[in-house]
Amino acid sequence: MRNILTIFLLTSTFFTGILWIIDHILLIKNYFYNKKKTKNNNTILINKVILENKKCFFRSLSSLFPTFFIVFIIRSFIYEPFQIPSGSMMPTLLIGDFILVKKFSYGIKEPITNKTIIKMNLPQRGDIVVFKHPKNNIDYIKRVVGLPGDKIQYDINRKKIKICINYTNQKNCENKLFITYSKPKLSNFFQKIYLLKSRTNEEEKVYNSIYFKKVEEKINNLKHNILILDGINSKINDYYQQKGMPKLIWIVPKNKYFMMGDNRDNSLDSRYWGFVPEENLLGKATKIWMSFEKKENEWPTGIRIKRIGNIY
């Protein structure tokens, strides 16, 4: 969908730009013809033709060129708006948040193929990044947890991570990041648990609701809140197994990144499908510019003014 809109903007900008150039050429011709003082009826005829050209339908279209051009430049190279469709980044980002993504955070990229034209900064640990999924090309948003060369270990029961930086096949982790977790506190977020009402027609009803616990995760000096569900774990076979590595341990390859959602038990991320190549990065999420009170697949019921601002 995003690529379709980009192609539409590019095509519209090009088409209206051509009409805009033609229109201005005709205006210039008209200006010089009007300056000429001649008794030749041909001049009058030419002026009439030019006046008719000015009233042509394409002149109305050509007037849209500046708008298409500005929107295309801003959206492709400066800031692009995105909507948060799911709860995988709760509590940092909620369903109904509309965010701005800084497109030039990690370089200037060609808007259609996403190939880097000018390379700039590299992603930092803790950045919230929009990227293309490495397999299905869908836009995702997650937090950068692992950088190239990191060894990531995930504790499936305690819901905690260990990170060894600049790992080069050593048996013991010599450069381990200092990671701490606060005591879990009950949050206002909950997940509905469904029970089959009838196995014949597969009707469902709400059986119970489990509230998430909020934990502050601090990686060196970077801290953010995450959500966990006590007593609920994914099957170990659901996790991505890197070639030559045991389950739940990954070594981040060169020019790739390990992404995780802040809603740890409701996020399909690098733990399940692997690493994100650098060329798939679209930009860094920086601000919430609008936030609607809504649930997934439902209409908004209000506006969350207090959520508008910077993203951390």
Swiss-Prot record:
EC number: 3.4.21.89
GO MF annotation: an example: serine-type endopeptidase activity
GO cellular component, one term: plasma membrane
Domain of life: Bacteria
Keywords noted in UniProt: Cell membrane, Hydrolase, Membrane, Protease, Transmembrane, Transmembrane helix
Chain ranges on the Extracellular side, renumbered to this chain: 85-312
Catalysed reactions listed for this entry: Cleavage of hydrophobic, N-terminal signal or leader sequences from secreted and periplasmic proteins
The keyword Phosphoprotein appears for this protein: no
Subcellular compartments: Cell membrane
InterPro entries: LexA/Signal_pep-like_sf (IPR036286), Pept_S26A_signal_pept_1 (IPR000223), Pept_S26A_signal_pept_1_CS (IPR019758), Pept_S26A_signal_pept_1_Lys-AS (IPR019757), Pept_S26A_signal_pept_1_Ser-AS (IPR019756), Peptidase_S26 (IPR019533), Sign_pep_all-beta_subdom (IPR019766)
Cytoplasmic side: 28-63
Name of the protein: Signal peptidase I
Gene Ontology biological process: signal peptide processing
Membrane topology value: Multi-pass membrane protein
Species the sequence originates in: Buchnera aphidicola subsp. Schizaphis graminum (strain Sg)
Keyword Signal part of the UniProt annotation: no
Record-annotated membrane-spanning stretches: 7-27, 64-84
Main location group: membrane
